[in-house]
Amino acid sequence: MTVETFTPTPLLFTQGAANKVKTLISEEGNPRLKLRVFVTGGGCSGFQYGFTFDEDVAEDDTIVEREGVSLVVDPMSFQYLAGAEVDYQEGLEGSRFVIKNPNAATTCGCGQSFSV
């Protein structure tokens, strides 16, 4: 009998997102800050993404580091975000962090909510 282990696909923290986080943390003057990405119920498609800066990291959080800054995800949110890409975009709609999520079956027009 063989036992298979599950290794989730990591979250991709793009260069653009890391650079913007670094800039925002520098402007805030608090090097302990990390970008926390989370999923909550709501939005027009059932779930929505959230972003906040946080100094605290829980023992079971997933941490992705790039360019000397950290992206943090709690375990409940990670199950919806495994394999996703966190990026920062500037365009006609303004500047914002965006998530390209391969787990999302549908997304709303603004890209901030999704269903699985």
From Swiss-Prot:
As to how many cofactors bind and how, the note says: Binds 1 iron-sulfur cluster per subunit.
Per its UniProt entry, which superkingdom is the organism in? Bacteria
**GO biological process entries:** iron-sulfur cluster assembly
The GO cellular component terms are: cytosol
Give the matching InterPro entries. Answer: FeS_biogenesis, FeS_cluster_insertion, FeS_cluster_insertion_CS, FeS_cluster_insertion_RrpA, HesB-like_dom_sf
Which Gene Ontology terms cover its molecular function?
A: 2 iron, 2 sulfur cluster binding; 4 iron, 4 sulfur cluster binding; iron ion binding
UniProt binding sites for iron-sulfur cluster:
44, 108, 110
User: What PANTHER family does the annotation carry?
Assistant: IRON-SULFUR CLUSTER ASSEMBLY 2 HOMOLOG, MITOCHONDRIAL (PTHR43011:SF1)
Oligomeric state and interaction partners are given as: Homodimer.
Q: What HAMAP family does the record point to?
A: Fe_S_insert_ErpA
Q: What is this protein called?
A: Iron-sulfur cluster insertion protein ErpA
Recorded source organism is Azotobacter vinelandii (strain DJ / ATCC BAA-1303)
